[in-house]
Amino acid sequence: MSEKSASSAPHRLIVIEGPIGVGKTSLARRLARSFGSELILEQADENPFLERFYRNPRAAALQAQLFFLFQRTRQLEDIRQHDLFDTVRVADYLIEKDRLFARLTLDDEEYALYDQIYTRLAVDAPVPDLVIYLQAPVDTLLERIERRGIRYEQHMDRVYLEKLQEAYARFFHEYAASPLLIVNAAQADFVSNEQDYTQLLEQITRIRRGRHFYNPLKSTL
């Protein structure tokens, strides 16, 4: 796939979303290279509470969630300080995911505190021109998590992933803020398989509005 210039990109802000291990960041990196665009990534390795959270979720859920909230808010403020129309950007998260994870990991008292902080931050996130929601079965997520080899993820709880997957499905069932492409990423390899990636890119460049579903043809390459 030849690289395109930023001026040829079909969207100014593309966001990739989906549960842990589905391939958001890898796809975001490749799209950014294709379009010559700025890459906005969640910096999970900077969160000092994340490893503790995976060992004992109840002991560090609030700290881990607030760290991500502040980190994401800073990144979005940086975007707002620049003219969104002058730069093509690809991101591997929606700010709305912050509340999604908070609902899943915090108890009622913690969530009430989190919600107060979120409200006071008055997060004003730019609206994406396209959101790509990657889906895959939990078994596939676990395989990919094991394969990428991040130490603190290696004991990821299956039940947690199942709940996370359900939360994403509910969220995107109602999502209407941007054009949405829902992709079955169970068997596709958008990083190493050129056919898989090219076919997805064709879908991305065609979408201007509405909700779309894409089930990649199994590659014979």
Please annotate each region the language model reported.
Residues 19:
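P-loop (Walker A) phosphate-binding loop of NTP-binding proteins
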Residues 1-12:
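Extreme N-terminal, non-catalytic leader segments
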Residues 24:
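Conserved lysine of the Walker
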Residues 98-169:
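A glycine- and Lys/Arg-enriched "phosphate-lid" helix/loop adjacent to the NTP-binding pocket
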Residues 146-154, 162-221:
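NTP-dependent small-molecule kinase module
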Residues 16:
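Hydrophobic anchor at the beta1->P-loop junction of P-loop NTPases
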Residues 60-126:
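Glycine-rich phosphate-binding loop used to anchor ATP phosphates in small-molecule kinases
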Residues 29, 33-71:
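Conserved substrate/cofactor phosphate-moiety recognition/catalytic segment
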